[in-house]
Amino acid sequence: VTYARARLLVGITGVGIWVVAAVAFLAADGPSVLPGPDATFSDQAAALAAVLGVYVLVSLPFDALGGYILPRRFGRSCPDRDAYVLGWARGVLVQAIAMALAVLAVVAAGRAGGTGAAIAVVAAIAMLIGVARMPIARMVADLGPSRVDPAHAGVVLVDATDPGFTGGVAGLGGRVMMPSSWTQALGQDLEVEVARRRAVAGAPYWLGLLLAAAWTVGGVAIAIALPGGGVQSVGQVAAVGAWFTLWSFLGLLVLPSVSRPGVMAADAAAAVAYPADRVAAVIRVLDGLQDDEPERPDVVEVVFHPIPSADRRIARLDPPCPGLRPWHAARMALPMSWCMLGLLGRAVHCNAGRPELWVLLPAD
């Protein structure tokens, strides 16, 4: 079993357990056990803390496998045990606080202005998470200093310990971010990856961001209307969270097919400015820093991977360049799911147990 397939198994199992748990919770009428609209604030807060505590405990073995055990088993870069535990605890605490504040804000809006107001708050939180992923990622994980790359105007280099950290595009202005380690890994070819990121930093980035937000808000709106759903209490919101987790699972199956063309479009844009062999070399180097899986079976890629395999990307470098495509929508939607108790945001194969990747998931 390769490192990539071992991680995939962890992700499939973790996601599967949360999907089964959500179905069981709804089928057993679990929301009725939690405080309803007439409960006091202290009862609501205690119930919310209990829900989040269960989330942390059930996630723990998959976090340990994905973030510590598998990297060490396969000789990947990994902090020592104490450093990992401290980093994991910090990430879990920040995520739990963020999810709790989001739930309380939605319930407050729902009580004050009804369902419409609650959905508006959900939309605001989802967009805030989307555009503020870099500062949120810094709160979740102990990312090192950032600095502007003197050789590439507008590019921010970020120190990170996880080799899976890729930076991305974030912020209102579509700021391009990359791990500082890539300056050594790519050398002069870093300019090729800079060209790729700049190609998606405008309309493709915003199209992907808005698509992720629309998927998130639409899913929450549907979940509120389903049995047990509502925005007046923690019990109702827990039901919404369970339904929304099932919606997020559907997103894991649907959104990668929307995201893959965006990767191909960025590759093709870089191949217009640079020789195809240089673009191919960058793709291979960066794939090696990730899961080192240059080739995948079609069914594995279609179902589980929003970023095509290195071999598939290289085979599609020839012009013509595709038109406008949304970029990174599948993986931008995952941290947005924090806005309504989405349980899959850090359970997928690429970021399970890796706090540096919980908000800024691996990008192409």
Residue spans for each PLM region:
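Polar-ligand-bearing catalytic/cofactor-coordination segments
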Residues: 1-231, 254-342, 356-364
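Flexible internal linker/loop segments at domain or repeat junctions
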Residues: 222-241, 247
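Hydrophobic alpha-helical transmembrane segments of polytopic membrane proteins
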Residues: 241, 245-257
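Blade-level signature of beta-propeller repeat domains, shared across WD40, Kelch, NHL, RCC1
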Residues: 352-353
